[in-house]
Amino acid sequence: GDNWSAGTTMELQFESNSTDDLTIDQNTATIASNSFTERKLELWFSNNDLGKIYLGQSSAASDGTMEEDLSGTGVISSSGYSGLGGSLAFRVSGSQGVSTGVTIGDLFSAQNGLNRDDRIRYDSPTFAGTKLSTSWVDGDEWDLAARYGREFDGTEVALAAGYWDASPTAQKTGYGMSASAKASFGTSLSASYSSEDIEATARDDEEFWYVKLGHDFEMTSLGGSAISIDYSQTEDQ
């Protein structure tokens, strides 16, 4: 009937010098796998009244719940620090470039839910700006997520929260949330917080928090511009 639709999503990539693989002392022209890899490869079935089901490789329900950001600068500045230079190593202070062996990816983690994987996912219809999601991921992982987006008198608001259980594969569970608001004059404020319980070790929970102040404007007739400043902290990574 008119309420039903079905389709497939196929998204492949050929990475060359991926931002999370580059190093300061890299001595090769490129870092690449010399092959295509899958990002998304799934079937989906959608009903206007019942929601949407996905089968295959793509984002789990909680993927991205730490990244609500209305600043317009997310492509280069986001809570996912490890994806923007995660292999860059810190240097020993006062040395001639001696590496500590500790990288950005070792110290910073947004704990951004379960990522892309083979899964079954369900998204509810959107009610009053709210959408609920859940997925079961290969390896008996599972998660829950909620997302909300509305506009109030010219102010945009976006919220997301998630819980994930990766106990069978990574011996951890976690939860996180993010929020972003953008005023009609272009200034935005975004924030996120997450915590993961590492079950296999007797240590404190990993915690992450992040804040960003942004502003977008039209500097020239060529189009819009956006700037932002952000700060984050990861504990017990």
Role assignments for model-derived ranges:
Residues 144-237:
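Detector for outer-membrane/organellar transmembrane beta-barrel domains
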